[in-house]
Design a protein with these regions (language model features):
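SF2 helicase catalytic motif II
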Residues: 4-49
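Inter-lobe coupling linker of SF2 helicases/translocases
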Residues: 1-9, 40-73, 81-212
Length: 212
């Protein structure tokens, strides 16, 4: 077992690869909260919890340039890895408690995945009490910004990005229509998620935009 190996400390580079940890919550049908996660992330959580217990909260070092990139839940996951005991001292024993203190669910009209219409969508996407949250996180985080590192980055021609618009050709229009049909099937529950899903459609749509 891991305990029998005698490991008393771990250093994890590219720690963002372990952000996909399953979140258990009473909030239903809210985007940004995933109840499914990767096995490697669950394994990492168990190792971090064990090392934290035998080292009084020490012995774990994460290094990453993107601790948060997709959802607010990734902040909770990082804190769960690195400062679970500190959260529990504040009475935060689970995600819903953390979310009640530091997050908010918003509902807005959004374009559907396939781009054929609009629908109301609830998302966990707004921080509250952000200064307090950052003060807690900085107890374990040494944050280095690009300005602090003084990285040698080449200047962007023109000083800002240039948006190039193009009209869709017949092929792009045909694929977009196919996205609509696929999305309707997925929404109706007539497709196995392992065969087709909204994430797959979104990914293919991004590739289509690049190809256009």
């Amino acid at each position: 077992t891991f305990e029998e190996l005698g490991v008393d400390s771990i250093m994890v580079d590219e720690a963002h690869n372990f952000k996909n940890l399953a979140i258990f919550s009473k909030m239903n049908n809210v985007s940004g909260i995933s109840s499914s996660g990767a096995k490697k992330s669950t394994d990492m959580q168990l190792k971090c919890q064990y090392l934290s217990e035998i080292n009084d909260g020490r012995g774990i070092v994460f290094a990453t340039g993107t601790p948060i990139s997709n959802t607010m839940c990734e902040m909770y996951v990082m804190q769960l890895y690195l400062q679970k005991a500190a959260l529990e001292e504040m009475g935060i024993y689970h995600f819903d408690s953390w979310a009640a203190n530091f997050g908010e669910v918003t509902t807005a009209l959004e374009l559907t995945v396939e781009g054929s219409g609009f629908r109301f969508k609830s998302r966990f996407n707004k921080f509250t009490n952000l200064p307090e949250l950052m003060n807690i996180f900085r107890e374990v985080a040494d944050v280095q910004t690009a300005d602090m590192l003084d990285l040698d980055v080449p200047a962007l021609r023109g000083g800002k990005p240039i948006i190039v618009e193009s009209e869709p050709d017949w092929y792009v229009k045909q694929v977009m229509e196919d996205f609509v049909v696929r999305a309707e099937r997925i929404r109706g529950g007539g497709v196995d998620p392992s065969v087709d899903n909204f994430l797959k459609i979104t990914h293919e749509a991004r590739l289509l935009g690049t190809d256009a």
